[in-house]
Regions:
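Extended amphipathic alpha-helical segments enriched in small hydrophobics
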Residues: 319-348
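A structural supersecondary motif
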Residues: 259-266, 283-325
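C-terminal regions of mature proteins
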Residues: 7, 201-206, 342, 353-413
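His/Glu-rich zincin catalytic helix
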Residues: 1-81, 188-295, 413-414
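Acidic/histidine-enriched segments that form metal/cofactor-coordinating
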Residues: 77-190, 303, 334-337, 347-375
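Short, conserved charged micro-motifs
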Residues: 111-114, 209-214, 269-271, 328-333
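Flexible, glycine/charged-enriched surface loops at secondary-structure junctions
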Residues: 229-235, 303-309, 345-355
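Second-shell loop/turn segments in exported
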Residues: 55, 70-72, 102-106, 126, ...
């Protein structure tokens, strides 16, 4: 992209970045005229981060600690954070994924007070044996609900087939047995390792300014220098072979769910370009504009939920195709045949351009929404990129790039 166009794009995106003395990355997109503000406080700590070394001490966590910690952050000696948010009128939530935990809220009033709730609860954790025991029962019920979800069981089943050792095999919430092992010491160790400001991102978009967000950081000690020691994640060797060729689960469903997974070589950290390229390739193969999707859908073999996705975390990269069908074996064979055809012939240039424009448009459209803006900023910042850099990178991807990548992924031996 020409330099003048890049400068114009950065002005249009209008993200303001600061790295505080504590190491915290702060990104703000002021959106004058908007009535609400969306704020996300995110850490690079997810369900796969179970084995690590910090200050010479090795820590090995049972499955589900990151998700458990997310729940416990909302409770301290002063009561429940949701009750405090209710007083400010903010709508708050949180979630844990494989590689991150995010705390968020949307506010139309009393933004300073809501920021104090968010920053206060995340920077001042409080755990006891009694509060942990109470939460173990609550999350245990949540785990049982996930066990009854065919869609979630399908995804975890795919991971169990693809991976021998990688912790992505384990459910994000853990099991009833694994969370029973959680102690206050484990939670405090996790906070020290992963909730250090240098491992976190604070993003805000809407009716706010960088000055307002920095003032909140000042109130909660996030402007002070902190130790720069980084946690060292520990991984078991993962072979490129499959753990299992297939798996079948019997559950009460109206239509069978199916999944086809490909185990790929792990990508380098923060390689968003290759991830975006893989995503475009999947759109060309199974997206709504692809010939395969039309044949499957028009033939009644799949419903609109059929499609593919890329999952990339540390030590793991896989491509998953999922959907519902009364003839899953036929769909799988048609999928494999289409992949072989496109690998030999190359991606359709017109479809590639349409898919690329669609992705590009989604990134631009997100700039007009406070929730999507903050989420987009936090998501890319956790991988070391700005939104403008991501847009520029996407614009530079070509069909020739896709053809070259296809020679190294989606191999039948890895399915």
């Amino acid at each position: 992209m020409p330099q003048n166009n890049q400068t114009l794009l950065e002005k249009t995106v209008a993200d303001q970045w600061q790295t505080l003395p504590s190491g915290l990355t702060v990104i703000v997109r002021p959106m004058p005229g908007y009535s609400s503000t969306h704020v996300i406080f995110a850490t690079r700590f997810g369900s796969i981060d179970r084995d690590f070394r910090l200050d010479g001490k090795e820590v090995h966590l049972p499955a589900g600690v990151a998700h458990f910690l997310e729940h416990k952050m909302f409770e301290d000696q002063d009561g429940d954070a949701f009750a405090k948010y209710a007083k400010t009128g903010a709508n708050a939530n949180a979630f844990t994924s494989f590689d991150r935990t995010c705390y968020l809220f949307t506010a139309t009033q009393q933004l300073d007070e809501s920021l104090d709730v968010l920053l206060g609860m995340v920077t001042h954790p409080y755990f006891t044996e009694q509060t942990i025991a109470k939460e173990q029962g609550i999350i245990g019920q949540e785990i049982k609900m996930y066990d009854d979800s065919p869609d979630w069981r399908l995804i975890t089943g795919l991971f169990e087939c693809l991976y021998h050792e990688h912790p992505i095999r384990s459910d994000i919430a853990g099991t009833v047995e694994s969370i029973a092992e959680i102690t206050p010491e484990m939670l405090y160790d996790s906070c020290k390792a992963f909730y250090a400001p240098g491992n976190m991102v604070l993003a805000a978009a809407g009716d706010t300014t960088m000055e307002q967000i920095l003032a909140a950081c000042e109130r909660h000690g996030l402007m002070r220098p902190r130790s720069t020691e980084r946690v060292q994640r520990l991984w078991k060797p993962e072979p490129m072979t499959l753990a299992a060729a297939h798996k079948t689960l019997k559950m009460p469903v109206s239509k069978p769910c199916f999944g086809v997974g490909f185990k790929e070589k792990p990508l380098p950290p923060n390689d968003l370009r290759t991830e975006a390229l893989y995503d475009l390739i999947l759109s060309c193969i199974t997206g709504g504009m692809s010939p395969l999707y039309r044949r499957l859908y028009d033939g009644g073999l799949v419903n609109p939920g059929f499609g593919g996705e890329v999952l990339r975390v540390d030590g793991c990269c896989c491509i998953l195709f999922t959907g519902e069908s009364d003839a899953p074996d036929a769909v799988k064979q048609m999928l494999l045949d289409e992949i072989a055809r496109i690998r030999a012939a190359g991606v359709d240039r017109e479809i590639f351009t349409l898919c690329k424009n669609e992705k590009y448009g989604q990134l631009i459209e997100n700039l007009e929404n406070v929730e999507d803006s903050a989420s987009q900023m936090a998501d890319f910042a956790l991988s070391g990129q700005t939104v403008a850099q991501q847009i520029t990178m996407l614009a530079g991807l070509t069909a020739e790039d896709a053809d070259a990548a296809l020679q190294h992924i989606l191999d039948r031996k890895s399915v």
